[in-house]
UniProtKB/Swiss-Prot annotation:
Role according to the record: Binds the lower part of the 30S subunit head. Binds mRNA in the 70S ribosome, positioning it for translation.
Highest rank taxon of the organism: Bacteria
Matching InterPro entries: KH_dom, KH_dom-like_a/b, KH_dom_type_2, KH_sf_prok-type, Ribosomal_S3_C_sf, Ribosomal_uS3_bac-typ, Ribosomal_uS3_C, Ribosomal_uS3_CS
Keywords: Ribonucleoprotein, Ribosomal protein, RNA-binding, rRNA-binding
Biased composition (Basic and acidic residues): 230-249
Organism in which the protein naturally occurs: Caulobacter sp. (strain K31)
CDD domains assigned: KH-II_30S_S3 (cd02412)
Residue ranges the record marks as coiled coil: none
Family, similarity comment: Belongs to the universal ribosomal protein uS3 family.
Keyword Cytoplasm recorded: no
Protein name: Small ribosomal subunit protein uS3
GO molecular function, one term: structural constituent of ribosome
Length: 249
């Protein structure tokens, strides 16, 4: 089961917490949920070049606090903060209220699963060989401290007539171990042959105590604020290096 389920959802309440942190009654819940979806979609599209990894939305007392984790915060802030001011105004219109905007820099984007997946997708769109892109990302992640990484790509790889899936893994990626701190990311590469899906799992270590805020604490130690607006499991198999497996589909 751990091989199939989303590793973030599986660990919610254990060593991960929700990215939307607010409470609403039945009448307001649907409205606020759709606002969250619209805000996330707009930010991901508008700030794609900034390398956005996570978007945290909190709603304390009729206000909205949005925290953006990005690899290139300067792209968001803009010259003399002009871009972030415009972004805050646009978010205020979408949420129909006051918005506090915080930007947090990700100092090691090579070990962030979402950013790794998006980087590989961008390389595939530039016609770089998928094996080269995968191996390069794996080497960078391991060099910068990741204890394990696995990357899946699926689709018409290399323009093949029949779609297939290939994966590479380095180190341990224990998907069944609930105390494991596993970062997960997904991206799509829109190529001339069709869409190629990219999935990334990065193992950061184990969280021994029950702490749903463990990820936030780790990111706080690794990152810095860039700007502010107001027996053995299947996943524990010995390292097989860069061996990949193909599945025809």
């Amino acid at each position: 089961m751990g091989q199939k389920v989303n590793p973030v959802g599986l660990r919610l309440g254990i060593n991960r917490t929700w990215d939307s942190r607010w409470f609403a009654d039945g009448e307001q819940y649907g409205k606020l949920l759709h606002q969250d979806l619209a805000v996330r979609a707009m930010l991901k599209k508008r700030l794609y070049q900034a390398g956005v990894s996570r978007i945290i939305i909190e709603r304390p007392h009729k206000k909205c606090r949005v925290t953006i984790y990005a690899a290139r915060p300067g792209v968001i802030i803009g010259k003399k903060g002009a871009d972030i001011d415009k972004l805050r105004k646009d978010l205020s219109v979408m949420t129909e209220g006051e918005v506090h905007l915080n930007i947090v820099e990700i100092r090691k984007p090579e070990t962030d699963a979402q950013l790794v997946a998006e980087s590989i997708a961008q390389q595939l769109e530039r016609r770089i060989a998928f094996r080269r892109a995968m191996k390069r990302s794996i080497q960078s992640a391991v060099r910068l401290g990741a204890k394990g990484i696995r990357i899946n790509v699926s689709g018409r790889l290399g323009g093949a007539e029949i779609a297939r899936m290939e994966w590479y893994r380095e180190g341990r990626v224990p998907l069944h171990t609930l105390r494991a701190d596993i970062d997960y990311g997904f991206a799509e590469a829109k190529t001339t042959y069709g869409i190629i899906g990219v999935k990334t799992w990065i193992f950061k270590g184990e969280v021994l105590e029950h702490d749903p805020m463990a990820l936030d604490k780790r990111l706080a130690t690794e990152s810095g604020p860039a700007g502010e607006g107001g027996g053995r499991e299947r996943g524990d198999r010995p390292d097989r290096g860069d061996r990949g497996r193909r599945d025809r589909g």
